[in-house]
Amino acid sequence: MLFVKYFMLFLILVASVLLGKNIARKYVNRLKELEEMRTALNIFRSKVSFTYSPIPEIFGEIAKDSKGNIGKIFSVASKKMEKVTANIAWSEAINEVDSNLNKEDKKILENLSKLLGQTDVEGQISQIDITQKFLDNQIQDAIDEKQKNEKLYSKLGITIGLAIVVVLAWNWLWWIDFVPWERDDSKNGYKFII
């Protein structure tokens, strides 16, 4: 019975540590995705400037070269462009793909869709440049949030886990198994046993 209690305490501690690490990882993943998006937009800008390839084809190439959620965004947008315009496909892809980007990040990326496929090459390059400047600000914010919150949530998970373990250990192990008290029903209380 005592082994089961120790094992449960261990599982509670591990679960709380993993929960804290998982929350902290979201800040790291957001920063990573913003940097990947900036790189993907640089590739997009270069291909629009020099190759004059159609946007669905460019997005398909970027999707193959990009990893994770950013690659999925470009892949979904490329596939959607077979049925809808580039600006609608881009906007829908950003919202459909489950990424670590927050609402403000997505809003900035959606602004790119306003001129996507609607204007000449110079207009699109200008919109990409504006989007990249806003992304740079978001990247700096993500760096600040990561530095502030990554350690906080990791340590918070450990601290909460230890607190729960201490409280449960006190109740389960100390009070029940080790305290030399015995219920004295005649006096409606407890008596100390030596």
Which residue stretches match the model-derived regions?
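A structural signal for alpha-helical segments
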Residues: 25-32, 104, 123, 151
